């Protein structure tokens, strides 16, 4: 069965597919691979990365992540959330027009990283209430020490093993089946790609109504 055949309601609306996981788990790589696969299947698709570093909030976030400016944990959490809210209408319009949207990091990253720093879970979650709920979440997870050995690790302030371990625990507490699909990120890139395609092929959109977090 082709990917296009597995999306029976794509003529009605697109899907919202979110990739989550700790840093250096291969999210961006798999987002790009899925994006190209869907394009080859003649499925209209867009790809978005959060934080979106091109906006005003995104530029501040970029400076913060690189250690160039200081912001309180509460302030940076709100800034990350605002960064998502800025383009949610565009995402919604795309989906309603039959375009599938792939997102590299979403609300769950914002919650996990903030809770890992000691903020209250419910407080962190409330800033996300009202954003679109994904149809599929691909959660890539693996051994933190393996992630730390990958190129570029440590270039941003959260890329520390002790922080990533806490983030991983927060992610594990948020997992809801069948929305979340957990994949071992320590595997070969192409094996992971195939597993993701299988998840999407098996997905059944029960109705075309959008749901919200």
Curated annotation (Swiss-Prot):
One GO MF term: ATP binding
InterPro entries according to UniProt: P-loop_NTPase, Thymidylate_kin-like_dom, Thymidylate_kin_CS, Thymidylate_kinase
PROSITE patterns: THYMIDYLATE_KINASE (PS01331)
Pathway: Pyrimidine metabolism; dTTP biosynthesis
Extent of the signal sequence: none
Keyword Transferase tagged: yes
Reactions listed under catalytic activity: dTMP + ATP = dTDP + ADP
Keyword terms of this UniProt record: ATP-binding, Kinase, Nucleotide biosynthesis, Nucleotide-binding, Transferase
Keyword presence, Glycosyltransferase: no
Enzyme class: transferase
Biological processes annotated in GO: dTDP biosynthetic process; dTTP biosynthetic process; dUDP biosynthetic process
UniProt-listed Enzyme Commission number(s): 2.7.4.9
Residue sites binding ATP per the record: 21-28
PANTHER family reported in the protein's UniProt record: THYMIDYLATE KINASE
HAMAP family: Thymidylate_kinase
Function: Catalyzes the conversion of dTMP to dTDP.
Family in the record: Belongs to the thymidylate kinase family.
Protein name: Putative thymidylate kinase 251L
